[in-house]
UniProtKB/Swiss-Prot annotation:
Residues 1-37 are annotated as: Disordered. It comes from Ictalurus punctatus (Channel catfish). Gene3D superfamilies: 3.30.63.20. Component of the small ribosomal subunit. This is Small ribosomal subunit protein eS25. Residues 27-37 have a biased composition (Basic residues). It is found in: Cytoplasm. GO terms for cellular component: cytoplasm; ribonucleoprotein complex; ribosome. Transmembrane segments: none annotated. PANTHER family: 40S RIBOSOMAL PROTEIN S25. InterPro entries: Ribosomal_eS25. Residues 1-22 have a biased composition (Basic and acidic residues).
Length: 124
């Protein structure tokens, strides 16, 4: 019986020797390929208002909860500069209310009927 054990020990040592070179030599890693990148469609936004868009501005924009030039530009498909000018016009007419003004971002919200009428009474 003891000779059989010695043979098994020799076999296991041979197996370990065979496995070691395989573990040491790793396969070469694949080169990472460059991605093509994302392609964006060109925006074709209006530079000046047409009648339909101007009506939509007065009808829909005062009902938005959050009003910024970016939101108006995206929804009405107009340029950012045109959206800023339009929001200033709506503000001057009292249709929207200024929330925050920063050099880079202006935020407006819709006028609630109670605060719009109540504000002039307190001043007078």
């Amino acid at each position: 019986m003891p000779p059989k054990d010695s043979k098994q020990k020799k076999d296991t040592s041979k197996a370990k020797k065979d496995k070691d070179p395989v573990n040491k030599s790793g396969g070469k890693a694949k080169k990472k390929k460059w991605s093509k990148g994302k392609v964006r469609d060109k925006l074709n936004n209006l530079v000046l208002f047409d009648k339909a868009t101007y009506d939509k501005l007065y009808k829909e924009v005062p009902n938005y909860k959050l009003i910024t030039p970016a939101v108006v530009s995206e929804r009405l498909k107009i340029r950012g500069s045109l959206a800023r000018a339009a929001l200033l016009e709506l503000l001057s007419k009292g249709m929207i209310k200024l929330v925050s003004k920063h050099r880079a971002q202006v935020i407006y919200t819709r006028n609630t009927k109670g605060t719009d009428e109540g504000a002039p009474e307190k001043e007078a």
